[in-house]
Every structure is written in structure tokens, then in C-alpha cells.
């Protein structure tokens, strides 16, 4: 252990001359190291136990929010719990391969790709669904734009592919919503 961040190449053991772009954007390892230093826990223990538990709780809160958004009518509100339970069963029983999102969420929670696939992308879709439900209103509420931005920033902090994927998803979704609204400048309102 060298007590430094991104100064030594983990593959060769030599000091790095400059920080590569891949690690410059994804700051989740730095945050994990900060939490480890502040709590006194080893970074491996921090990543596997407290950090993983918090991310799994956020994941299940995201599932409940998706159910609440999809079944927002009074008559459909009883299906929110059914949706959340079914999603939890699919998550628990979805461990059929090492590369499916369910395995990423429960077995490799601390990795940035798991957070991107299970929290950031569903959050972006959730906020796009919320924006699509405002078709009858004059304009999309500012809070939806803010939450889409937060989903994009958190995806960027987790993995560098999130820096491209979530903004592209948000722009594509807003483009579809503006076409449905027949207001081609609705994104800027």
C-alpha cells in the first residue's frame, strides 16, 4: 500500500506519469478510498459490506419509485407492492450468468458498471417516463431535468461509459418526447 491515489500503475507497479482519461472521470474509487480512510476500514471491507449495502438499498428504492411512477392511479396503487416484489424476485433469482445485471447488483455491487446498469440507467428511464407523463402539461417540470442531470453525473462518477451513455439516453428520450408533443423546441422550454 502506497497511501496514494492514482499515482502508481496497478498493472506494473511503476509510478504513472499522468492520469489517464479512464480514471480521471470515474471518481468512485477515490470516494471509496476516502470513505475507507475516514472510517478506518480496509477499502475491500468498505466496498463489500457498508458501501454495497447502501447501493443495494438505493437499488430497491429505485424499484419502488419505478413502481410508484408506473402505477400512479388510485385504482392501480395496489400493484406497486406486487411490482416491487416481482422485481425483487427477478433480482434474486436472476443469477443465471456472470454478466447479467442481477449478478452485477448482488455479487459485484461496488463496481461502477453495476451501479450504472442497475441504478443510473433505470433512474434515467424513470425520469424520462416522468417527463413523458407531462405531455398534457405546458412544460416539463425543472425537477425532472435536475434529476436527469444528477443521474448523468452519478453515472459519470461511477464509470466513464456513463459519461456518454446517460446523456445520450436523456437527449434521445427528450427528443422522442418533444416529437410526441409536436413541439420540437420543447426541450428548451
Which residues fall in each region the model found?
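Hydrophobic core segments of transmembrane alpha-helices in multi-pass, intramembrane catalytic enzymes
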Residues: 56, 117-124, 166-170
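Membrane-interfacial entry segments at the cytosolic side of transmembrane helices
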Residues: 75-77, 140-143, 182-188
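Membrane-interface alpha helices of multi-pass inner-membrane proteins
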Residues: 144-160
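Hydrophobic alpha-helical transmembrane segments
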Residues: 46, 81-85, 145-150, 187-188
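Active-site lumenal/periplasmic loops and adjacent helix-entry segments of GT-C-fold
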Residues: 1-90, 94, 99-110, 115, ...
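Specific aromatic-rich, kink-prone transmembrane helix
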Residues: 110-135
Amino acid at each position: 500500500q502506497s497511501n496514494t491515489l492514482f499515482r502508481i500503475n496497478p498493472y506494473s507497479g511503476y509510478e504513472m506519469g499522468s492520469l489517464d482519461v479512464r480514471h480521471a472521470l470515474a471518481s468512485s474509487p477515490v470516494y471509496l478510498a476516502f470513505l475507507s480512510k475516514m472510517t478506518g476500514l480496509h477499502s475491500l471491507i468498505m466496498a463489500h459490506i457498508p458501501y454495497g449495502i447502501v447501493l443495494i438499498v438505493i437499488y430497491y428504492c429505485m424499484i419502488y419509485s419505478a413502481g410508484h411512477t408506473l402505477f400512479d392511479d388510485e385504482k392501480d396503487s395496489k400493484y406497486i407492492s406486487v411490482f416491487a416484489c416481482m422485481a425483487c424476485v427477478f433480482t434474486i433469482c436472476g443469477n443465471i450468468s456472470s454478466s447479467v445485471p442481477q449478478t452485477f447488483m448482488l455479487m459485484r455491487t461496488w463496481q461502477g458498471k453495476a451501479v450504472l446498469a442497475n441504478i443510473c440507467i433505470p433512474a434515467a428511464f424513470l425520469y424520462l417516463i416522468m417527463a413523458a407523463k407531462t405531455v398534457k402539461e405546458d412544460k416539463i417540470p425543472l425537477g425532472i431535468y435536475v434529476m436527469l442531470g444528477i443521474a448523468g453525473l452519478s453515472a459519470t462518477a461511477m464509470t466513464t461509459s456513463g459519461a456518454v451513455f446517460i446523456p445520450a439516453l436523456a437527449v434521445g428520450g427528450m427528443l422522442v418526447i418533444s416529437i410526441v408533443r409536436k413541439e420540437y423546441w420543447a426541450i428548451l422550454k
